Amino acid sequence: MLKPLGDRVVLKAETEEEKTVGGIVLASNVKEKPTTGKVIAVGEGRTLENGQKLAPAVKEGDRVLFDKYAGNEVEYNGEKFLVVHAKDLVAIVE
């Protein structure tokens, strides 16, 4: 499994519907990039100047909102994931 370093978080982005409410199929260039995802793994956190670690405020299994253009897409074992910095996470969805 992927183990993020520092303050990075691995997400499984939630995909949007491929059809509109009216049943129109959307082309791939029209669909918005996902902005919600499930936390798969969390790094140890960033190191502060005094040497202490500041862990990200999320945990595995959380559903989160993130900035639209945040992170890097990676493929691992045939699955696509998004690796983002904790600062790019906007909120936890409850």
From Swiss-Prot:
A cellular component term from Gene Ontology for this protein is: cytoplasm
Which molecular function GO terms apply here?
A: ATP binding; metal ion binding; protein folding chaperone; protein-folding chaperone binding; unfolded protein binding
**BP terms from Gene Ontology:** chaperone cofactor-dependent protein refolding
InterPro entries registered for this protein in UniProt: Chaperonin_GroES, Chaperonin_GroES_sf, Chaprnonin_Cpn10_CS, GroES-like_sf
Q: Which PROSITE patterns match?
A: CHAPERONINS_CPN10
Q: Which residues cross the membrane?
A: none
The main location is cytoplasm
> Where does this polypeptide localize?
Cytoplasm
Classification via Pfam families: Cpn10
What the entry lists under SUPFAM superfamilies is as follows: GroES-like
Keyword terms of this UniProt record: Chaperone, Cytoplasm
For this protein, the record's Gene3D superfamilies field holds:
GroES chaperonin
Q: What's this chain's function?
A: Together with the chaperonin GroEL, plays an essential role in assisting protein folding. The GroEL-GroES system forms a nano-cage that allows encapsulation of the non-native substrate proteins and provides a physical environment optimized to promote and accelerate protein folding. GroES binds to the apical surface of the GroEL ring, thereby capping the opening of the GroEL channel.
State how it assembles: Heptamer of 7 subunits arranged in a ring. Interacts with the chaperonin GroEL.
Query: What family does the Swiss-Prot or TrEMBL record give for this protein?
Result: Belongs to the GroES chaperonin family.
Name of this protein = Co-chaperonin GroES
Q: Which organism is it from?
A: Limosilactobacillus reuteri (strain DSM 20016)
Give the gene symbol.
Answer: groES
